[in-house]
């Protein structure tokens, strides 16, 4: 426990310095996954360490063997993510072959490979993380001029996170501070990427307007078919809280085509203390195949909100649930799939449901099949 709580400004400054460490080695589009991954590892380990200390105090009367059995049983940790030995920040371990493995904070060589093993271990120990980490974050990949990042750079980044705050809620100025800091990182990388950053981030002011139009309420199901980093779903829950409701009494659903962005979204939900929502974020092409199903068909929701990718192509022969597009099919080529997203959103509404979306102005004026769909 620290005397002075960590403020959002302090945590943002800390994360800025993380980016500085990597900035000289590669473009921001290449290193964003590394900072997201490192932050996630540190947060999970810090939470785990806190729960582990509580278990040790609670069971201090037991023998060493009995206590260790409890400490290594992931069922002992309740809602806290279980961090296996391979992924622990502060504690090394000796394996069955009597080989000692350093804690993350003490990594010195083959660091990219070791960090990948840590990610894989924590994913394999927590079902909700299946497919999120090891398939989408690769600390050992080549960047820039086809070179792997040097151990010295990884060591600097690890040392920076090790010198920073312990990332547990009790140390935060407000409960959702880490989630807010994660949103700050997402905006930082979107701004750095310029126009391309729009694939995973929509400005907060725009999201806020859409959410105010939708007016989500407790007990509803809210869906974003092009979820990106998840900001629209998160703001929907926050809106309910601002209206005096319980943000955990809204079910959030999303789907994202890009693998790394999908992983960023799932981690975003977890860092906003909403693991249920993380489990409801699917990875896949929404136009081709909506993955949220109910009674053998695509699921319907009380509220649908999205900023679909503008001007995309699609392949009609691959499309499932064609009944979603009752107004007609837009051209497959020429980057004119915008009204396909609109129709999917309409088809995904429950009776008396409401949707809000962002579209390029071309959908209002283009002729051909798009004109027929509008009519």
Residue ranges and their predicted role:
Residues 1-218, 277-286, 291:
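Non-catalytic, mostly N-terminal accessory regions of nucleic-acid modification and defense proteins
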Residues 188-191, 320-326:
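Gly-rich Lys/Arg/Thr-decorated short loops/hinges at beta-loop-alpha junctions or inter-strand turns
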Residues 40, 48, 81, 232, ...:
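Aromatic-residue hotspot detector
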